């Protein structure tokens, strides 16, 4: 069942945890890819120096952050990679959730070829884990780029999120990664992941 628009009206800190275990659906190249979300980070523009929307900073690039919850925000980094975020909360709040890692559920050969130009059974165990264990890695594997920016994740199209299996798991809360510039926000425990999942980017 597709998650409805109301689900995304939750604040980023709540949504970042609620998204764990949910299933991303991506239809591309004639295949339907499925993956479980296993790691997220919350960003809250009003108080968070790590956020693109800190202190109400609003630009053409960051505009998706100020839209109503439930759309995709995809941005470009280092001149070659993409990161995928889910916008949370109400319009003009400037909040979002970075999706840091997926657990692939199907089409393993397709994903392996996208990431490493190899069949899945040719990969080492390390490479198998590395297919989607980071924000840019999962974008490569799932063909997520700027064309997904602003897409409504509650509409059944080629990119949306479904309710996952009713698994029981423990959520680990810890510091976010790669935000050394963010002063006191460095220490905010706003990264969340499923304990014991082998696809998380970093313990």
UniProtKB/Swiss-Prot annotation:
<dbReference type="GO" id="GO:0006284">
    <property type="term" value="P:base-excision repair"/>
</dbReference>
<dbReference type="InterPro" id="IPR003180">
    <property type="entry name" value="MPG"/>
</dbReference>
<keyword id="KW-0378">Hydrolase</keyword>
<dbReference type="InterPro" id="IPR036995">
    <property type="entry name" value="MPG_sf"/>
</dbReference>
<comment type="similarity">
    <text>Belongs to the DNA glycosylase MPG family.</text>
</comment>
<dbReference type="Pfam" id="PF02245">
    <property type="entry name" value="Pur_DNA_glyco"/>
</dbReference>
<keyword id="KW-0234">DNA repair</keyword>
<dbReference type="GO" id="GO:0003905">
    <property type="term" value="F:alkylbase DNA N-glycosylase activity"/>
</dbReference>
<protein>
    <recommendedName>
        <fullName>Putative 3-methyladenine DNA glycosylase</fullName>
        <ecNumber>3.2.2.-</ecNumber>
    </recommendedName>
</protein>
<dbReference type="GO" id="GO:0003677">
    <property type="term" value="F:DNA binding"/>
</dbReference>
<keyword id="KW-0227">DNA damage</keyword>
<dbReference type="InterPro" id="IPR011034">
    <property type="entry name" value="Formyl_transferase-like_C_sf"/>
</dbReference>
């Amino acid at each position: 069942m597709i998650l409805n628009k109301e689900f995304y009206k939750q604040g980023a800190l709540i949504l970042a945890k609620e998204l764990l275990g949910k299933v991303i659906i991506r239809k591309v190249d004639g295949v339907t890819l499925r993956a479980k979300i296993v790691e997220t980070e919350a960003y809250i523009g009003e108080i968070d120096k790590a956020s693109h929307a800190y202190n109400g900073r609003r630009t053409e690039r960051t505009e998706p952050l100020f839209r109503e919850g439930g759309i995709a925000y995809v941005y470009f980094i280092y001149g070659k990679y993409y990161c995928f975020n889910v916008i949370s909360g109400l319009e003009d709040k400037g909040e979002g959730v970075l999706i840091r890692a997926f657990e692939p559920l199907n089409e393993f050969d397709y994903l392996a070829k996208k990431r490493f130009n190899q069949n899945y059974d040719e990969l080492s165990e390390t490479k198998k884990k590395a297919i989607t264990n980071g924000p840019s890695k999962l974008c490569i594997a799932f063909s997520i780029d700027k064309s997904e920016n602003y897409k409504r994740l509650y509409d059944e199209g080629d990119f949306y999120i479904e309710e996952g299996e009713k698994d029981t798991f423990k959520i680990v809360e810890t510091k976010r990664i790669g935000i050394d510039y963010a002063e006191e926000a460095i220490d905010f425990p706003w990264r969340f992941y499923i304990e014991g999942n082998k696809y998380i980017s970093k313990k």
